[in-house]
Design a protein with these regions (language model features):
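Bacterial N-terminal signal peptides that target proteins for export
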Residues: 1-8
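Cyclophilin-like peptidyl-prolyl cis-trans isomerases
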Residues: 8, 12-182
Length: 182
């Protein structure tokens, strides 16, 4: 009986160790997004969108996203941020060619916002709250929330009659590439 208890304890603790390793498996392609309610861990997908992931990391390392707002948030759909103007019209000034894939937009997917021009993505991104099939193959998927989606779900919602525009919007407190965090 004692051996069984020791074995079960080892399996239990081993499961925790493996999950920690899985979260930190690729710190160069993991983002840590700090929101008012807590930290969100994002697995970036350079296998799906190498140019977008490279540009996001470049902007993150410049501190570009720190303090920017989630200017457009539609309940049951998504939260959009990454615009230095805070109104959906701004960016970093560098457009990225589309890298569409067959990766579905499921809860926690990060994808690039853009205009009607498929190659107009810049710095703005959105996180979907629920399965959004109508986006599949039309927007560049570059990441997935792996931890902290409950914090994303608490981002202040916008006025649906104004296409989700948020008065006094929540901000990105800080965004970092995990490998850069000491």
């Amino acid at each position: 009986m004692a051996r069984l208890a020791v074995f079960l304890l080892a399996v239990f603790l081993g499961g925790f160790a493996m999950s920690d390793e899985a979260q930190a498996a690729d710190p160069e392609n993991t983002l840590l997004l700090n929101l008012k309610d807590g930290q969100v861990v994002i697995e970036m997908r350079p296998d799906l969108a190498p140019k977008h992931v490279a540009r996001i990391k470049e902007l993150v390392r410049q501190g570009f996203y720190d303090g920017l707002t989630f200017h457009r948030v539609i309940g049951g759909f998504m939260a959009q941020g990454g615009d230095p103007k805070g109104n959906g019209t701004g960016g970093s000034g560098v457009n990225i060619p589309a890298e569409f894939s067959d990766q579905p937009h499921v809860r926690g997917t990060l994808s690039m916002a853009r205009s009607s021009d498929p190659d107009s993505a810049d710095s703005q991104f959105f996180i979907v709250f629920s399965r959004s099939r109508f986006l599949d193959g039309k927007y560049t998927v570059w990441g997935q929330v792996t931890k902290g989606m409950k914090h994303v779900g608490k981002i202040k919602r916008g006025d649906e009659s104004r296409n989700g525009t948020v008065d006094d919007p929540d901000k990105i407190i800080r965004m970092r590439v995990a490998v850069d965090v000491k």
